[in-house]
Amino acid sequence: AMIGNRTMIDMNAVIGSGAQIGDDVHVGAGAVIAGMMEPACTTPVIIEDGVFIGANAVVAEGVRVGHHAIIGAGSVVLHDVEARAVMIKAPAEKIRERTVDDEQRLCINQTLRKKEVGDHFFDETMD
């Protein structure tokens, strides 16, 4: 798999070997991103930059998820997802576009990615 910068992959997530994941993506615990090499698939899973994939969600083989989309927990994505779409259910359906409120709720992921936060945390605990 190809995994971008500042991407977070939570515990028990499965990333197929042919998957391509962009920068600043969050893959929730137990999520499955297909992308198996055997049997070979002509179209890999592509997760563009800034996507949030909830816990236990599944992105099927050959799907492209557009930048800054949100895939809800437990959703099963069988078809391509537009940029900034919010998808839920199994099979996944678009319910709306990503909003400013979504950005604020997801900002914790950006905070956790910053090296300064980790350094500050470790500095305090080392005293």
Q: Predicted segment positions?
A:
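Internal active-site segments that recognize and position negatively charged phosphoryl groups
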Residues: 1-19
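Glycine-rich hexapeptide-repeat left-handed beta-helix
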Residues: 17-127
